[in-house]
Amino acid sequence: MDIKLKDFEGPLDLLLHLVSKYEVDIYDVPIVDIIEQYLAYIATLQAMKLEVAGEYMVMASQLMLIKSRKLLPKVVETIEAEEDPELQLLHQIEEYRTYKLLGEELALKHNERAQRFSKPKLELIYDDITLKQDKTVLDVFLAFSKVMAEKQEEIKNSHTTIKSDDYRIEDIMTVVEEQVIRQKETNLSWFFKRAGSLNEIITIFLAALELIKVHRVYVKQEHNFDDIILRKESA
């Protein structure tokens, strides 16, 4: 089974998604938290042996610089707005959001005009392998990134040897689905916490995504940053 995750449209698209989860003004977001989530996302892609585009790595290095400045003791210094990397980043995100909203509005008007003056196309395009990048999948992936970061830290601080186990996605899909059927709904974190290795966590994640993709389980999240809940019926 080959599962691929489409990239965001770019690093700013990923940052905008992370910022929007806080539902506050861009300039009021906890920038260090945003940076840590971004870096966890990149680290997770690398742990899963997925290719990370160069532009994401360039942004990661810029974010690490901003984070280090935020965590260092305060030094009295005057920084011009155009030289402040944090402020520059927030300006970039705000500008990207403006253009993205404008693009979505233009696309909507184009579709409305096309429907008014032409017959609808009967062509349907299916993509059986690549998971489409929607909010549900993104939120599941971000929740997974957080767990991966915690598990990697746990293993790093442990003196035990983790054996390399082989986990089949199809087998884990059955385990996840049977648990959801029994309990009606189960937190995704419930499965992660019971995993004994990074390999098992990765397989659980891929199994959950595949179940969501084929509509054998559905996702519920009451509020941003709440646990991801897997359920048998759509909300």
From Swiss-Prot:
GO terms for cellular component: cytoplasm. One of its GO terms (biological process) is DNA replication. It holds the Pfam family SMC_ScpA. It is found in: Cytoplasm. Transmembrane segments: none annotated. Its main location: cytoplasm. Keywords: Cell cycle, Cell division, Chromosome partition, Cytoplasm. The keyword Cell division applies. Belongs to the ScpA family. Participates in chromosomal partition during cell division. May act via the formation of a condensin-like complex containing Smc and ScpB that pull DNA away from mid-cell into both cell halves. Component of a cohesin-like complex composed of ScpA, ScpB and the Smc homodimer, in which ScpA and ScpB bind to the head domain of Smc. The presence of the three proteins is required for the association of the complex with DNA. This is Segregation and condensation protein A. It comes from Streptococcus mutans serotype c (strain ATCC 700610 / UA159). The gene is scpA.
